[in-house]
């Protein structure tokens, strides 16, 4: 496994602890005497005005539209690198996690739709349980240390990247608002400029960021979700260059700490604060949170494992080296940790759906993701060989 992937796995696993702390802090504040201050902080208006450009949004939307665009820029860089030289660079390597990712998105979406098909507003949340939070999933896996085979970590990483790619497509197709043709035209022009820069071998990251900023503003104003600008810029950064060995890897390395230790924890803090006041068992079992909980905890492992098993049995794909189906099943449960990615989709799905839909969806995400983390950890602990014990025995 390359040094880049090793560093990535180590960093993302460590950030999971900070994510948990950020989410817990948000929950504590939302259910304490500081709830009003917490909400007021998120509602703080932040205005940026440059000549005719005027962007005035609450802090919450700056986090969701701005900071998360940087996160999706990183996702774009990761997907491109893996497709060119990593775990997704060959058909044999990519087939198994790709098929698993498709199953892991379809089954949760169908389960959610089953419980919410009659509610027009709730139906918009069908993609919420389809996402996987790679930081949390790798963080849980890291608790088992060297017992986890490298090939199993790479499988989870590749699956999560495919999952992210699916989320990007879903956002583009299903969560786009009424379009502004003028802003969209500027966005297309900025994209073509980035493509031209890539084709002519431009490798100065600063120029890509400058055009990328124009693209982000245009996409923000167009009605398409602004995070897609980050993905586009990520795909346009060249893997190799004349001045720099790899502009893509250089930018990826620079963004990882900011994403792991600031952007995702800040997003978790801003979106995980669910007030539990007046929420009882009946609320927890209402269609929206129930569909999300079952989608994450039941649908994810059902979809990932079943379609993976069928693909191997039918000869369409093959298991990674040194990995068995028990371990794949355990990892498929960990894929039900939706958390930040699920909350991001929920913020888009219920942006205009009312307070209850937003709160109930976050509640379902928290419960479903927690169950997936606990059960997934226990299942993986049972499925993995006790390598450390074996090594200590050999030394006697």
UniProtKB/Swiss-Prot annotation:
- Domain of life from the UniProt record: Bacteria
Keyword Cell inner membrane present in the record's keywords: the answer is: yes
GO molecular function term, any single one: sodium:proton antiporter activity
One GO cellular component term: plasma membrane
**What protein does this entry describe?**
Na(+)/H(+) antiporter NhaA
Indicate the family of this protein. Belongs to the NhaA Na(+)/H(+) (TC 2.A.33) antiporter family.
Sorted alphabetically, which HAMAP family does this protein's record hold? Answer: NhaA (MF_01844)
Per UniProt, which keywords does this protein have?
Answer: Antiport, Cell inner membrane, Cell membrane, Ion transport, Membrane, Sodium, Sodium transport, Transmembrane, Transmembrane helix, Transport
Q: What does this protein do?
A: Na(+)/H(+) antiporter that extrudes sodium in exchange for external protons.
Where is it located?
A: Cell inner membrane
Transmembrane spans: 16-36, 59-79, 95-115, 124-144, 154-174, 178-198, 213-233, 254-274, 278-298, 328-348, 363-383
Q: What reaction does this enzyme carry out catalytically?
A: Na(+)(in) + 2 H(+)(out) = Na(+)(out) + 2 H(+)(in)
Any one GO biological process: regulation of pH
Its placement in the membrane is given as:
Multi-pass membrane protein
């Amino acid at each position: 496994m390359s040094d880049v992937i090793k560093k990535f796995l180590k960093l993302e696993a460590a950030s999971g602890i900070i994510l948990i702390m950020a989410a817990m802090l948000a929950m504590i504040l939302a259910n304490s005497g500081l709830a009003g201050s917490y909400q007021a902080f998120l509602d703080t208006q932040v205005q940026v005005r440059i000549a005719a450009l005027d962007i005035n949004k609450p802090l919450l939307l700056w986090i969701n539209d701005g900071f998360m665009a940087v996160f999706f820029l990183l996702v774009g860089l990761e997907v491109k690198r893996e497709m060119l030289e990593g775990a997704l660079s060959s058909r044999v390597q990519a087939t198994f996690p790709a098929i698993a990712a498709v199953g892991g998105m379809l089954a949760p979406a169908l389960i959610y739709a089953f419980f919410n098909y009659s509610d027009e507003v709730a139906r918009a949340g069908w993609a919420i349980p389809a996402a996987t939070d790679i930081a949390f999933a790798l963080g849980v896996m890291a608790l088992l240390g060297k017992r986890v085979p490298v090939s199993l970590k790479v499988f989870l990483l590749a699956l999560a990247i495919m999952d992210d790619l699916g989320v990007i497509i879903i956002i583009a197709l299903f969560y786009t608002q009424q379009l502004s043709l003028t802003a969209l035209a500027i966005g297309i022009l900025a994209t073509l400029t980035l493509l031209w820069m890539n084709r002519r071998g431009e490798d100065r990251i600063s120029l890509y960021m400058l055009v990328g900023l124009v693209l982000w503003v245009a996409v923000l104003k167009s009605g398409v979700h602004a995070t897609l600008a980050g993905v586009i810029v990520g795909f346009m950064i060249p893997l190799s260059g004349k001045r720099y060995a790899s502009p893509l890897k250089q930018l990826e390395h620079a963004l990882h700490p900011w994403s792991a230790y600031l952007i995702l924890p800040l997003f978790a803090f801003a979106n995980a604060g669910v007030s539990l006041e007046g929420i009882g068992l009946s609320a927890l079992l209402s269609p929206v949170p129930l569909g999300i909980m079952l989608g994450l905890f039941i649908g994810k492992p059902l979809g990932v494992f079943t379609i993976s098993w069928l693909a191997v049995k039918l000869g369409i794909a093959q298991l990674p080296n040194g990995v068995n189906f028990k371990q794949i099943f355990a990892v498929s449960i960990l894929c039900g940790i939706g958390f930040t990615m699920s909350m991001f989709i929920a913020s888009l799905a219920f942006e205009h759906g009312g307070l209850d839909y937003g709160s109930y969806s976050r509640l379902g995400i928290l419960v479903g993701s927690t169950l997936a983390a606990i059960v997934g950890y226990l299942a993986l602990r049972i499925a993995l060989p006790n390598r450390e014990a074996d090594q200590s025995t050999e030394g006697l």
